[in-house]
Every structure is written in structure tokens, then in C-alpha cells.
Amino acid sequence: ENDMAGASTGGLDQNASMRCTEGHALLLDCRPELTPLENVSQQAFDLDKYGLELLVVDTQAPHQLNDGQYAQRRATCEEAARILGVANLRVAADGISKADDQFQALKETLDALPDVTMKKRVRHVVTEIERVRSFVRAFAQGDIEAAGRLFNASHDSLAADYEVTVPELDVAVDVARKNGAYGARMTGGGFGGSIIA
């Protein structure tokens, strides 16, 4: 996709397709220093145990991954990491999560950045890392309501801070939430496509 189609994409879809096993969710850690054997773990994801189903809803909203918006967000995050003096935003997120006052640590991190757009992108990335960690814990403990709230918070951050949703995604998420979904969020690269609920 990167070389042939000119789309600056990641590897989430490919990893999920090739490495996930039935009844599990794939927890993928994309830090560059990890090998393919180190960067993935299978998390038990037995929805039947809770009488739940995971729905994937295609909004039919077209999107293009080669229009530069994905690459622009990635470049903004890489520049933010450079400004913060860290190898990547995962390092910043790890520092924030270890702080005694995480809210203050996040505020100080964002205050070090030069513009509102960069602050929003970084806020999404570092809070999303913590949401993923919290989701894994909540689901492992059987706290489906907390897991659903984290799904919702993820979508809200993707809409407000990372700015990759479109009206069709937001409407589909809203409809799912109003009709009994514990949580709903967009999935994929954004700017169209599908939600999961």
C-alpha cells in the first residue's frame, strides 16, 4: 500500500488478518524496537460468555487513504515527538501514565507543543494508548460497561482531537449507542468506512 498505491498506511489490518486467532483480540504494540514475535499478544475476547455480539457496520462513506490526511497526522505526531524529545509518542504516553498526577503530566506535555492542532493530535494518541490498556483490563475483568465507555471515549477523541471521523461515522456511532450498544467507535483509518459496536 505504501509503495504501490502511494498510501501512507500502517499495518493494523494486515496484522489482524494474519495473526489474530478465533476468540481473541489482537493487542499490537507498534514500537519499532520490538520484533514480530514480541509486538503481539492474543487477548481472550469471548463475547458469547457475556451474551454479546460485535457488529461491524459499513457506513458506505467512501474514503481514500492516498489523499494525504493519514500521512499528515502521522507527520504531525512524529514532529511532536521530536519537539518533546522522545522517540515516539508511546514514550510520552508511558511517562504520563507513570506520573503521580497524570492530568498535570498531560497538561505539561501539551503545553510544550506549539499549536492547537498538534496538541489535539498528541492528546488523542497518548490518551488512546491509555484507553487501550484500560480496555484490556476492563474486558479481562468482565466489566463490559467500562469497556463500552472506553469504546465511546475512543470515538469521541477520534472525532474531536484526531479529526478523522465524518458525519456518516458519527451518525452510525450515535445510532448504535442509542440502541443498546455498550460502546461504539469508528474503525480503520477514518474519513469514511466502518464502525464497530
Where are the regions a protein language model picked out?
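Glycine-rich, mobile lid/loop segments that gate access to catalytic sites or pores
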Residues: 1-8, 14
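C-terminal nucleotide
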Residues: 18, 22-183, 197
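Structural motif
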Residues: 193-195
